Amino acid sequence: MKIVPDVEPAAEVSGNFKVSVLEPSIPAVHRVENKHPLESRLKNWEAQQQQIRLDSMRRIYGLHEPVRREMEQKLASQSSRPLALGGSANFHLDILANREAVLDETDIYAAPIPLEMTYQNEMAIRYGL
């Protein structure tokens, strides 16, 4: 069982060194990314933690518990919340993923709601009425 996701290499380095004495002999970098090395681990962190939770539930409760959780998460992700009621904050997914007490940038920097957008207008746009 892995707790931390694998590290993806940030750049590839070849062994082509400079021949001249006056020029510094450093390896040539073919691809450079402006990312911190921990960013690749953080990108996969949530998926890795979810897999650990599902594995531990399978060992404790049996196979039905992770299957039921994944079905609930799929159903909760398909539901949408109208813009007139505050946008796409999906509390059901947060509860199922055990993130109901987590406050991140999507909670603070939400997209502004158009002034003319009402529930009826949004349903008309969504269903082409």
Curated annotation (Swiss-Prot):
InterPro entries: Ump1. It is found in: Cytoplasm; Nucleus. The keyword NAD does not apply. It holds the Pfam family UMP1. GO terms for cellular component: cytoplasm; cytosol; nucleus. Its main location: cytoplasm. GO terms for biological process: proteasome assembly. Keywords: Chaperone, Cytoplasm, Nucleus. Short-lived chaperone present in the precursor form of the 20S proteasome and absent in the mature complex. Required for the correct assembly and enzymatic activation of the proteasome. Belongs to the POMP/UMP1 family. This is Probable proteasome maturation factor ump1. It comes from Schizosaccharomyces pombe (strain 972 / ATCC 24843) (Fission yeast). The gene is ump1.
